[in-house]
Amino acid sequence: MVDMGGLDNLIANTAYLQARKSSDADSKELQRRRRSLMLPGPQSCEQLRQALATDFHSLCEQQPIGRRLFRDFLATVPAYQEARGFLEEVQSWELAEEGPAKGSALQGLVTTCAAAPVPGRPHPFFSPALVTKCQAATTDDDRASLVELAKAEVMAFLQDQPFREFLASPFYDKFLQWKVFEMQPVSDKYFEEFRVLGKGGFGEVCAVQVKNTGKMYACKKLDKKRLKKKNGEKMALLEKEILERVSSPFIVSLAYAFESKSHLCLVMSLMNGGDLKFHIYSVGEPGLDMSRVIFYSAQITCGVLHLHSLGIVYRDMKPENVLLDDLGNCRLSDLGLAVQIQDGKPITQRAGTNGYMAPEILMEKASYSYPVDWFAMGCSIYEMVAGRTPFRDYKEKVSKEDLKQRTLKEEVRFQHSNFTEEAKDICRLFLAKTPEQRLGSREKSDDPRKHHFFKTINFPRLEAGLVEPPFVPDPSVVYAKDINEIDDFSEVRGVEFDDNDKQFFQRFATGAVPIAWQEEIIETGPFAELNDPNRPAGCGEGSSRSGVCLLL
């Protein structure tokens, strides 16, 4: 007899894996769609030109297309190109591994700054005072401080006349064309949908592929009726707004937010490597090698620090919410419980997952703030090492009240042989019962990255993506439940939508998120293709009257 569930899973997995392999613009259908694309004409950009804030940091540093076009503009003026080249050399020095080569690079930067300008003509971007100080520098500490000053002077220079000239140049006109293109409406027709990856309280997560770029994403589909029935609209909007704000390589990024007839959809980074809970318990003996524990903990710490820098408390830090990408790097996911701190006021609402909640969350009428994430971090490091959480053994049946009392009263014990002294110490500090004694919260400058547990991690290189992960997921494996193991939802009856609901849906469905969308356009090829001056003119079949070919 044929196992239809197994057959359905095989078919879904095969289509999904094939889509992942073909996401590099090699299919004929994708090439045909690409040929139909065309940027809007300059005349359609005038309204945006008047409305768009001309902020240097946003236009030339944060937004990938703006950064690329500003770089191309600088290359047209020798002095501007020289300034850009200096900043690139500074970045290379900052990210270099410690050693003689880094020292030589520092000396070279100071020599560049100390070079005497042409008599009677001041240096275009270094002040006379800086040049004099660089000429007199004798120690590496002095040189490093002077390079930081030089970097600041070059940035100030670029933000002045070069930026004004950029705004009046064809390069900025091109940027506006891309911004108009970015603002086109997005619907479910924009994507090809593949297998379901999982389900949550309000809907399912499935794999999708952008039809015109081949980029794969995860789409979190929130059932509109289920959201309304369970009063989940506010939480869904908060998660969406938080995802829009975050910009970290260690947190899943939001690329699109749109609505279909039945769902509100969040399109986010697709993490093909599975979650850390799977890797802890389902691959070999419970627990992970210490090299992986340190690497993942370092990336998670960077992600949590980024959230805290934005005034956000995560509240759901646990291995199940940490996902691996194709290369083996990890990101925090599921920000559904994350909350924005308002005016520095602590939180009182209880939220989190049993076994990872800090004592101050569990205590009656207690308030809490950022330190709860560091307690959960301690639980997660412990679990990665030992294959169990600090206060409950794996699969141990224990009541919520017993687990609460253990968390409040018991001291953590380290019985697993894999614990190093550094791992024990960082877990003890993260798992301190009171927030004031907890690592990351003892004082304003208390940075967990400085703990000796991370002595092998070069954090600037880690944040730049230059540290090789200790484990790379198998690209031929689907790290997700079989589709027949994912329960279906029952139909929600008796829910009708009014004008307030429709306004909420429109507020949620804002389309493409600029940074993620621009990264996709550059990464998958349309940026180079549509900017190519030798590309044949004309939009082909299906062009719109505005001159923009919609990505349908």
From Swiss-Prot:
Q: Major place of localization?
A: membrane
Q: Which residues carry this modification: Phosphoserine?
A: S36
**Propeptide residue intervals:** 550-552
Active site annotated at which positions? D316
Residues forming the AGC-kinase C-terminal domain are 455-520
Domain called RGS: residue spans:
56-176
The keyword Thylakoid is assigned to this record: no
Q: How does it sit in the membrane?
A: Lipid-anchor
Q: How is it modified after translation?
A: Autophosphorylated in vitro at Ser-490. Phosphorylation at Ser-36 is regulated by light and activated by cAMP.
Lipid moiety (S-geranylgeranyl cysteine) attached at C549
The answer on whether this UniProt entry bears the keyword Amino-acid biosynthesis reads no
One GO BP annotation is: signal transduction
Q: Which residues bind ATP?
A: L197, G198, K199, G200, G201, F202, G203, E204, V205, K220
Location comes to: Membrane
**Ranges where the Protein kinase domain occurs:** 191-454
Listed A to Z, the keywords are: ATP-binding, Kinase, Lipoprotein, Membrane, Methylation, Nucleotide-binding, Phosphoprotein, Prenylation, Sensory transduction, Serine/threonine-protein kinase, Transferase, Vision
Please state how the activity of this protein is regulated.
Answer: Inhibited by phosphorylation of Ser-36.
- What Pfam families does the annotation carry? Pkinase, RGS
What functional role does this protein have?
Retina-specific kinase involved in the shutoff of the photoresponse and adaptation to changing light conditions via cone opsin phosphorylation, including rhodopsin (RHO).
Annotated family: Belongs to the protein kinase superfamily. AGC Ser/Thr protein kinase family. GPRK subfamily.
Q: What is this protein called?
A: Rhodopsin kinase GRK7
Q: What is the lineage of its organism?
A: Eukaryota, Metazoa, Chordata, Craniata, Vertebrata
